[in-house]
């Protein structure tokens, strides 16, 4: 969700098919480990049973489930996926993950080892052993999970939790400060 919000705020076109959807953490890491395979060799298929369970469209790329929570139909989700897939620049990737939805320390370690120069994982606490980890104090939903970073911190400031991260520097300098 954050990718769409940040892209919208910075007036950037959605150049990733992963905008407005989510993956389970272990499946997201598997997706990233074989990104070209999942993006360019797999056909997005509907998972009708999981869609019924979730109440929104769920797709499948081989062994990866893709949760399209902001779409009304699988057809609409697949159309947007394929449209944005054509815009992917494999030489200009920014990878973002959030410690939630069952994310484990093992998942964080696996994410940290991924061979991407421009990556960040927002975490519920400090993890000094992981270079890609970034903790926003107060953003914890509980001890093992980060709340929705698109939520406003309070009704007075107009600041969202994601505003505590310097997105412009991350996108321009391509590294964590």
Enumerate the predicted regions with their spans.
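Beta-sheet entry/capping signal
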Residues: 93, 118-119
């Amino acid at each position: 969700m954050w990718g769409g919000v940040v892209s919208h705020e910075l007036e950037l076109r959605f150049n990733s098919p992963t905008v407005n959807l989510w993956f389970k953490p272990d499946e997201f890491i598997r997706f990233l480990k074989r990104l070209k395979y999942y993006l360019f060799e797999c056909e997005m298929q509907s998972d009708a049973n999981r869609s019924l369970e979730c109440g929104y469209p769920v797709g499948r790329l081989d062994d990866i489930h893709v949760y399209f929570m902001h779409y009304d139909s699988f057809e609409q989700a697949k159309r947007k996926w394929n449209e944005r897939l054509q815009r992917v620049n494999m030489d200009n990737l920014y990878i973002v993950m959030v410690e939630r939805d069952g994310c484990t320390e093992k998942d964080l370690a696996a994410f940290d080892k991924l061979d991407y120069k421009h990556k960040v994982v927002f975490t519920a606490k400090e993890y000094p052993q992981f270079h890609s980890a970034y903790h926003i104090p107060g953003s914890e939903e509980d001890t093992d999970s980060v709340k929705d970073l698109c939520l406003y911190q309070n009704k007075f400031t107009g600041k969202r939790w994601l505003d505590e991260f310097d997105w412009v520097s991350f996108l321009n300098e391509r590294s964590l400060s």
